[in-house]
């Protein structure tokens, strides 16, 4: 068993292309250099449209710890509209980091779950 490192969670969730989707309004990372190398305890303030008028968007601060907690939650109970592929990738983060391979879609699902509390866009 090898759990994902902070660098790996950053790479899989922030670097997989999900933030290119139009509903991601703002991304403010800290603890990461210009090359994407984690330099300490990283965080990312993310703002996502909600799909509703009020409020039109939500903001949350994501970190390695938040991602790992969300991965465990998804493993325990698959959120509505979440793919089984995303659930499997969450299991890899927790138990077999070398096998983790998030793409834009699966990382977007987990990011929406963490920021919005549900998966709205897909």
Labelled PLM ranges:
Residues 1-57:
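Long, contiguous N-terminal structural blocks used for assembly/anchoring
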Residues 6, 86-87, 107:
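Short amphipathic alpha-helical segments that mediate assembly, nucleic-acid/protein binding
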Residues 60-62:
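Generic detection of short hydrophobic beta-strand segments and adjacent strand-loop junctions
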Residues 89-91:
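Long acidic/polar interaction regions in large eukaryotic complex-forming proteins
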Residues 96, 101-121:
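Acidic, proline/glycine-rich low-complexity IDRs
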């Amino acid at each position: 068993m090898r759990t994902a490192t902070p660098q790996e969670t950053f790479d899989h969730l922030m670097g997989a292309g999900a933030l290119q989707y139009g509903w991601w309004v703002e991304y403010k990372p800290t603890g990461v250099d210009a090359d994407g190398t984690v330099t300490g305890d990283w965080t990312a303030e993310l703002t996502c449209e909600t799909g509703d008028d009020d409020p039109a968007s939500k903001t949350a601060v994501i970190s390695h710890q938040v991602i790992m907690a969300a991965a465990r939650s998804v493993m325990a109970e698959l959120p509505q509209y979440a793919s089984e592929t995303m659930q499997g990738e969450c299991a890899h983060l927790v138990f077999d980091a070398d096998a983790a391979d998030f793409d834009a879609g699966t990382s977007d699902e987990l990011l929406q779950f963490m920021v919005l509390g549900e998966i709205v866009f897909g």
